Amino acid sequence: MPYSRDITKFITATEPEVGLPLLALQRSKSVIGIILLVISLLLIFIGIIILSVSSHTTAGSVLVVLSLILGGGGFFLIYKDNS
């Protein structure tokens, strides 16, 4: 039965129809994770500026908390790919 193989054989497969899509999926997860981290760092920076400059402390703190959650998701995607 060709579909009862171990998952490690799919990951290390040299067949283009099996190996390349998995490799592309793994790279895209890493790229998405890095993009999420960069966006979250920018949002944290903007949130800190909002907190320090203006009187919109609620909006700034919500922005910082949401960006920390977003960055945690990006870090999780990168960490999961590397483990």
UniProtKB/Swiss-Prot annotation:
Induction: Expressed in the late phase of the viral replicative cycle.
Gene Ontology CC entries for this record: membrane; virion membrane
Cell compartment(s), UniProt: Virion membrane
Segments traversing the membrane: 31-51, 59-79
Domain of life of the native organism: Viruses
Major subcellular location class: virion
Keyword field: Late protein, Membrane, Transmembrane, Transmembrane helix, Virion
Family assignment from sequence similarity: Belongs to the asfivirus EP84R family.
Name of this protein: Transmembrane protein EP84R
Species assigned in the record: African swine fever virus (isolate Pig/Kenya/KEN-50/1950) (ASFV)
Lineage, highest ranks first: Viruses, Varidnaviria, Bamfordvirae, Nucleocytoviricota, Pokkesviricetes
